[in-house]
Amino acid sequence: LIALATDGRRRGVIGLPLDMVAMEQGIAGLVPALRPDGWADAAAAIMTTDTRPKLASARLSSGAVITGIAKGAGMIAPHMATMLALIATDASIPPTDLDRYLRVAVEESFNRIVVDGDMSTNDTALLLANGAAGLAEGDPAEFQAALTGVCIALAQAIVRDGEGATKFVTVEVGGAADEANARRIARQIAISPLVKTAFYGADANWGRILAAAGYAGVALDPARL
């Protein structure tokens, strides 16, 4: 069962036709070699400019497992980018529930990262449930938390492996009127070139952070900053 896949799952140079003959020949040879412990090989196979594979997994109290792989290092910005995230569970879950779970997880993970502030024409987050364990997802809250945790781990791995990245920075906003305002401020800080250069140079110029927050389009009380 496929929960969600955005259009355009192809990677590579934009505008060049995909060599379907090579793809079909490759698939024909790969299918007989499929095995349950092939996740690490799959994570390595989808790498492009990545320097290391990205893999995360979680086990539920029911015994079901959620495992995911991802690729991405450049053209990474909020609302996804030139990245792939392929996640599977052996729990038995209806597609409508999978879709809901994945949308929440993606919003709290892949849609909150940035490397270079640029995006691509193609990206995908895919969640499959094959029901092989013969188990339901159990507690919905537990499944959601586990799936979100897997997605966050993969998203953070993408940032840590960002092209030219030397630092991993988390932006936390407190005291905002609502979630939307907090996200706008955090995103503006995260994509600010001046904030990035300050972190790169280990320059504690917090004024750049305030400036970025100030032009995020959200009402601010300077006395609370």
Per-range role (PLM):
Residues T67-T82, V115-T121, F199-A204:
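Conserved phosphate/anionic-ligand binding catalytic regions in large, soluble enzymes, centered on
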Residues I2-F110:
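Glycine-rich, mobile lid/loop segments that gate access to catalytic sites or pores
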Residues P94-L154:
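Acidic, glycine-rich loop-and-beta core segments that form the ion-binding/anion-interacting portion
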Residues G12-I14, A125-A132, T166-D178, W206-Y215:
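A short beta-alpha structural unit
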Residues N130-G201:
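A glycine- and small/hydrophobic-rich beta-loop-beta segment
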Residues D37-A43, F110-N122, A153-T170, K196-D203, ...:
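Flexible, glycine/charged-enriched surface loops at secondary-structure junctions
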Residues R184, I191-L225:
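Internal helix-turn-beta structural module
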